[in-house]
């Protein structure tokens, strides 16, 4: 039964903000249990809302989910609680901001053993910008290693709440969950009653169903949506019929009407999930709203990588798999490309490194496609001498040096939260990665928040792994894109016997090009198998070779059959062998094994 007019004041829309592993999905399970949306014996798996295998395995939430719960408070009133689950990872911050826009309140969940982490702060700022009521919650208070008082001080310093406003819970054991439910009802504001206004509904997520097409999850901000209405999407001006609308409580419940304040879903035979864009506004054709809801933007991919099938005859399988994946993931962008070394494949754009890993893992796991990935890189802006601007996301597309005026690369602002004893290590890593140090804030006596600005190209690679290893796993990071800046960048080519291998070329800063070239040549020397002739591995910038390694030839002893005898006989055989090797070198192609392309990814090891 959808809420009627009198019940708009009984609706509470809220989300949970937390760093990875701070217990967000477990807390959501407890809320479902307390409200009897699900009984504990029905929970075949923990983390009910994380329904992808990958989400459960990595312990992260990738897609936003929504679930409606009914709760009878201690004041005897029946409330409708809409929990909108948000992805917690930096790559998905736009999805987070749209999920937050669908809420009036947020639970800020902090692990009692870990304290405030970087992504908690980043998402908290998004929530404050969205004007949400924030309820701080300390989770995992039952663990022996928990420091509840210390974490409470961090939260007070961060958002300036009173100590008694901070709730203490253990999501796993259900301690304090009843108090939390009462706090949600008491502190989260009810939605505004805008039913008289023209319809405006915010899409905060969309999923693809093989039978129904794209299903949009929506929050009705203004007006009323009825089943059978003709609706228009602002982003692409397309018109659809609302075939089915309803609310979500782990499964879809069809209703006839959704009013301002409600959260639900909309099915209208949309063939492509790209037509139901996250952040878009839906209005009625008959009585349209004058303008869309604020905050919509087209999400641009930040990291690019080539995906190639291991077996060249699997190209069509890869195409089909990418098509199916992109139905569910509107932020995945891909175009076909060819490489002389790897054959046919796709150039894919991702929101960030985690997004890239997830796509690769899902391709291999859900679709059984074995793929090779090239070095991830970012999109550079090349200002030509003619004055035009070219965007380059693949080193092999870089124009000739003589035609380039200058090159710009994307920068990000990053905050790193860590224990104070690791500051030195992190500063060193920051300087190695061309970071600009900004400032340091102390969160408490032992934890600091360090601000840097980095070129995105230095961060997309293995920065997160390095950060974790130098801080023994204690550092967490979060970054946001701040724009393009001019840099002294060069294209580094790898030549095998004078032939460039396009899949191994990369764009690096001039100051690092010699070291990178040398390391790459040494790495390849250990991977490329020996041939019957000498192989020269060279790293070059333009026509200038800056590093070289040689793989010596395998040699057959042609003198074995000459026991004694004349030196000229031996010389003749050696000359003949030399001649043959020279001819082989001219016609032979060096086979580059697949490990060589992966070597670039772990060049420092």
From Swiss-Prot:
GO biological process, any: positive regulation of translation
Keyword Transferase recorded: no
Broadest EC class assigned to this enzyme: hydrolase
SUPFAM superfamilies: EF-G C-terminal domain-like, P-loop containing nucleoside triphosphate hydrolases, Translation proteins
Chief place of localization: membrane
Reaction equation(s) it catalyzes: GTP + H2O = GDP + phosphate + H(+)
EC number, as in UniProt: 3.6.5.n1
Protein name, UniProt field: Elongation factor 4
Organism: Chlorobaculum tepidum (strain ATCC 49652 / DSM 12025 / NBRC 103806 / TLS)
Gene that produces this protein: lepA
């Amino acid at each position: 039964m959808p809420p009627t007019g009198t019940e708009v004041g009984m609706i509470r829309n809220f989300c949970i903000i937390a760093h990875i592993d701070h217990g967000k999905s477990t807390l959501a399970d407890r809320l479902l249990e307390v409200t009897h949306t699900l009984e504990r014996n029905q929970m075949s798996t923990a983390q009910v809302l994380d329904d992808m295998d990958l989400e459960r395995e990595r312990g992260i939430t990738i897609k936003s989910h929504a679930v409606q719960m009914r709760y009878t408070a201690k004041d005897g009133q029946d409330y409708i609680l809409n929990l909108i689950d948000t992805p917690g990872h930096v790559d998905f911050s736009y999805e987070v901001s749209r999920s937050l826009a669908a809420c009036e309140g947020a639970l800020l969940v902090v692990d009692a053993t870990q304290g405030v982490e970087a992504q908690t702060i980043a998402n908290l700022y998004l929530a404050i910008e969205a004007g949400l009521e924030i309820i701080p919650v300390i989770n995992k208070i039952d663990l022996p290693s928990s420091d509840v008082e210390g974490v409470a001080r961090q939260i007070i310093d961060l958002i300036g709440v009173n100590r008694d406003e901070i709730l203490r819970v253990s999501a796993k054991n259900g301690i304090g969950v009843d108090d939390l439910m009462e706090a949600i009802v008491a502190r989260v504001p009810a939605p505004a009653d805008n039913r008289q206004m023209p319809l405006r509904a915010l899409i905060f997520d969309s999923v693809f169903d093989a039978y129904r097409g794209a299903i949009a999850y929506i929050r009705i901000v203004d007006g009323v949506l009825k089943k059978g209405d003709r609706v228009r999407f602002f982003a692409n001006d397309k018109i659809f019929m609302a075939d089915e609308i309803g609310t979500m409580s782990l499964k879809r419940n069809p209703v006839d009407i959704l009013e301002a304040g409600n959260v639900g879903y909309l099915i209208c035979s949309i063939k492509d999930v790209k037509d139901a864009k996250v952040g878009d506004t839906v209005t009625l054709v008959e009585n349209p709203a004058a303008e869309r809801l604020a905050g919509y933007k087209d999400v641009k991919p930040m990291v690019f990588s080539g995906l190639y099938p291991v077996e060249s005859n699997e190209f069509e399988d890869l195409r089909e798999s990418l098509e199916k994946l992109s139905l569910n993931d509107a932020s995945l962008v891909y175009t076909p490309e060819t490489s002389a070394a790897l054959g046919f494949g796709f150039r894919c754009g991702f929101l960030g490194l985690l997004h890239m890993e997830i796509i690769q893992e899902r391709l291999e796991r859900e679709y059984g496609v074995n793929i090779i990935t090239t070095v991830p890189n970012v999109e550079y802006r090349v200002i030509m001498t003619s004055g035009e601007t070219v965007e380059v996301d693949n080193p092999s597309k870089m124009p000739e040096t003589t035609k380039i005026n200058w090159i710009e690369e994307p920068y990000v602002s990053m905050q790193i939260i860590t224990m104070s004893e690791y500051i030195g290590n992190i500063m060193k890593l920051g300087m190695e990665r061309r970071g600009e140090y900004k400032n340091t804030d102390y969160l408490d006596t032992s934890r600091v928040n360090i601000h840097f600005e980095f070129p995105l190209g230095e961060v997309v690679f293995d920065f997160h792994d390095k950060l974790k290893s130098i801080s023994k796993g204690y550092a967490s990071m979060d970054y946001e894109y701040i724009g393009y800046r001019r840099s002294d960048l060069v294209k580094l080519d790898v030549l095998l016997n004078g032939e460039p291998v396009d899949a191994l070329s990369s764009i690096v800063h001039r100051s690092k090009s010699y070291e990178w070239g040398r390391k790459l040549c040494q790495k390849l020397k250990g991977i490329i198998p020996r041939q019957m002739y000498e192989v020269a591995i060279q790293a070059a910038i333009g026509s200038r070779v800056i590093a070289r390694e040689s793989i010596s030839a395998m040699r057959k002893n042609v003198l074995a059959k000459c026991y004694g005898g004349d030196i000229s006989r031996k010389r003749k055989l050696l000359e003949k062998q030399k001649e043959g090797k020279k001819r082989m070198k001219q016609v032979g192609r060096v086979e580059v094994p697949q490990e060589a392309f992966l070597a670039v990814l772990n060049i420092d090891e």
